[in-house]
Regions:
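PAPS-dependent sulfotransferase catalytic domain
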Residues: 81-191
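Short amphipathic alpha-helix with an adjacent loop that forms part of the alpha/beta core around
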Residues: 71-79, 181-182
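PAPS-dependent sulfotransferase catalytic core
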Residues: 1-75, 188-202
Length: 202
């Protein structure tokens, strides 16, 4: 599961991981793509309210009494299911991190964090309300967007602290330690991004 506030550069990190470490990427399609200049863009399925899938993913505890229906929703955009890991992307998982940890065992939760103001500014630079994919209507307007970015960062911090984990800088060393050695070059633009990978055990 990939979790990060808008503008946190979470999409770029998700693409870097899924394209270089043998992930299931059969959810990609021309309709599920947004490219903006040098911005890495959006690719593949995104979940959350007002989006194509997972309209109730901002209220997991109230919407999902069991694992099966949630799993079916997560699997639904993938043309082919296999043993390869899938990257399930949702900003609003921030509101249900404890539920994910307690109910979806044997998985990983990758949280991505960046300064709130920088996140908002980058989201606007990448297109803001003109971003064609995914749909950001749930965030309403600039004022609400800034509030939600703040809130999602705070909830991620609380979760990381409560599970006894720590944030780390997203760099080559962290990537190699957590996903295996690679020849990936991480752009300097990610130097202000922090990450935390949390395992949910059986």
């Amino acid at each position: 599961f990939l979790v990060g506030a808008p503008g946190s550069r979470w999409s770029g990190i998700g693409q870097l991981i899924s394209e270089n470490f043998d992930y299931n990427t059969t959810d990609k399609s021309p309709e599920r793509q947004y490219i903006h200049g040098s911005f890495s863009g959006h690719s593949g399925s995104y979940f959350g309210p007002e989006m194509e899938l997972g309209n109730d993913f901002h209220r997991l505890e109230q919407s999902y009494m069991g694992y099966a229906r949630f799993e079916a929703m997560c699997n639904s955009p993938f043309k082919t299911l296999s043993d390869k890991p899938k990257l399930i992307k949702c900003h609003q998982f921030a509101y249900g991190l404890d539920w994910l940890k307690e109910n979806i065992q044997g998985s990983n939760i990758l949280l991505v964090k960046r300064d709130s103001d920088k996140s908002f500014d980058w989201w606007k630079q990448a297109g803001g309300w003109d971003i064609s994919y995914p749909n950001y209507a749930w965030y309403v307007d600039d004022v609400h967007m800034q509030h939600y970015i703040d809130t999602e960062i705070k909830l991620a911090n609380i979760f990381v602290n409560s599970t006894g984990n720590e944030w780390a800088t997203f760099d080559k060393k962290w990537l190699d330690e957590n996903f295996g050695d690679s020849d990936i070059i991480i752009p300097d633009s990610y130097s202000d991004v922090e990450v935390c990978l949390i395992h949910t055990f059986w």
